Amino acid sequence: LGINGKVLRIFDKRTQQKFALKMLQDCPKARREVELHWRASQCPHIVDIVDVYENLYAGRKCLLIVMECLDGGELFSRIQDRGDQAFTEREASEIMKSIGEAIQYLHSINIAHRDVKPENLLYTSKRPNAILKLTDFGFAKETTSHNSLTTPCYTPYYVAPEVLGPEKYDKSCDMWSLGVIMYILLCGYPPFYSNHGLAISPGMKTRIRMGQYEFPNPEWSEVSEEVKMLIRNLLKTEPTQRMTITEFMNHPWIMQSTKVPQTPLHTSRVLKEDKERWEDVKEEMTSALATMRVDYEQIKIKKIEDASNPLLLKRRKKARAVEAAALAH
């Protein structure tokens, strides 16, 4: 039994109805996950918990969480598999509205999800009218004032800048993830990437922390400046400057999604062409998740004055020599 739990497909013998079963080793963390997920599952865009059982498995106490079965697959797989039919800006807007509704509900009841990423966004069925739902509350946390978030648990391509440094972070972490997902929806690739095929390289860390990304053509040539500005407001490196979920939901591109132009996007083609890389990215993210959830206590970033950077030492030495020479004259 893993700490984050394995999900199995099960069915009701009486009705033949399908469900998803998540097994968690019984511990305070697991109970917290179940409690927060249960509280949130009233939202139509969050996977519903049907029942929770305590049991013994291989002699260990465990929790069995019975949830609705989401048969429609992952968000980006669905866009990838759509054939020749172009994915449009209006569809991207409608998808972002659905995800926004889930986050809005969570934030309104003081819960931060902290792991909003495409793999945790699943459709209820393969039908065109299927509902997109947010899953996996393994890293969700209550965000009351006495309990600000201090544990980094993240997936490289969707990790907010403040998770990489020692600053505290809160609901704005989810907003940053929304920005990354929106960016991918509109072009088919992430705004931050590793040049070396590593899950999270030093260069990528720097780009994330500095908020360095572009809107390259041809993929972005037809996307309006208003939409790019919305992404910029979600990807702000300073959490306090980042858009809140209320501001996001009130933005015309989200609020009036039916009026958004049906501009064909490159997303589906790019995702198809990069299918192998996309799978690698997901694998990297999964393995990186296991290794990167470190306690903030272990992250100590030295002040620049105390840093023993050889380049800085060289510069300081040179500066002192220049100063000494000037004084001598």
Curated annotation (Swiss-Prot):
Protein name per its UniProtKB record: MAP kinase-activated protein kinase 2
Catalytic activity: L-seryl-[protein] + ATP = O-phospho-L-seryl-[protein] + ADP + H(+); L-threonyl-[protein] + ATP = O-phospho-L-threonyl-[protein] + ADP + H(+)
Species assigned in the record: Cricetulus longicaudatus
Keywords, sorted A to Z: ATP-binding, Cytoplasm, DNA damage, Isopeptide bond, Kinase, Nucleotide-binding, Nucleus, Phosphoprotein, Serine/threonine-protein kinase, Transferase, Ubl conjugation
Domain Protein kinase residues, every copy: 1-254
Motif Nuclear export signal (NES) per UniProt: ranges: 285-294
Record flagged with keyword Transmembrane: no
EC category name: transferase
Protein purpose: Stress-activated serine/threonine-protein kinase involved in cytokine production, endocytosis, reorganization of the cytoskeleton, cell migration, cell cycle control, chromatin remodeling, DNA damage response and transcriptional regulation. Following stress, it is phosphorylated and activated by MAP kinase p38-alpha/MAPK14, leading to phosphorylation of substrates. Phosphorylates serine in the peptide sequence, Hyd-X-R-X(2)-S, where Hyd is a large hydrophobic residue.
Binding site for ATP: 1-7, 22
Motif position, Bipartite nuclear localization signal 2: 314-318
